[in-house]
Amino acid sequence: MRMFKITACVPSQTRIRTQRELQNTYFTKLVPYENWFREQQRIQKMGGKIVKVELFTGKPGVNTGLA
């Protein structure tokens, strides 16, 4: 199964007292080859940035610490 292992950074807004603080959330996930374009659009619509993309073959959850 062809997959992409992507690392992305997405801003998440949290309210602290009365001011807004912008925090970035980094995450790594496996995305199937067929869903890559949709996932890329989703991250960019959220104002995120894709940091790294690797081609990954094998089963989901193996060698990524997601198991």
From Swiss-Prot:
It comes from the Bacteria. It is a peripheral membrane protein. The keyword rRNA processing does not apply. GO terms for cellular component: phycobilisome; plasma membrane-derived thylakoid membrane. It holds the Pfam family CpcD. InterPro entries: Allophyco_linker, Allophyco_linker_chain, CpcD-like_dom. GO terms for biological process: photosynthesis. It is found in: Cellular thylakoid membrane. Residues 1-56 form the CpcD-like domain. Keywords: Antenna complex, Membrane, Photosynthesis, Phycobilisome, Thylakoid. PROSITE patterns: CPCD_LIKE. Rod linker protein, associated with allophycocyanin. Linker polypeptides determine the state of aggregation and the location of the disk-shaped phycobiliprotein units within the phycobilisome and modulate their spectroscopic properties in order to mediate a directed and optimal energy transfer. Belongs to the phycobilisome linker protein family. This is Phycobilisome 7.8 kDa linker polypeptide, allophycocyanin-associated, core. It comes from Thermosynechococcus vestitus (strain NIES-2133 / IAM M-273 / BP-1). The lineage of its organism: Bacteria, Bacillati, Cyanobacteriota, Cyanophyceae, Acaryochloridales. The gene is apcC.
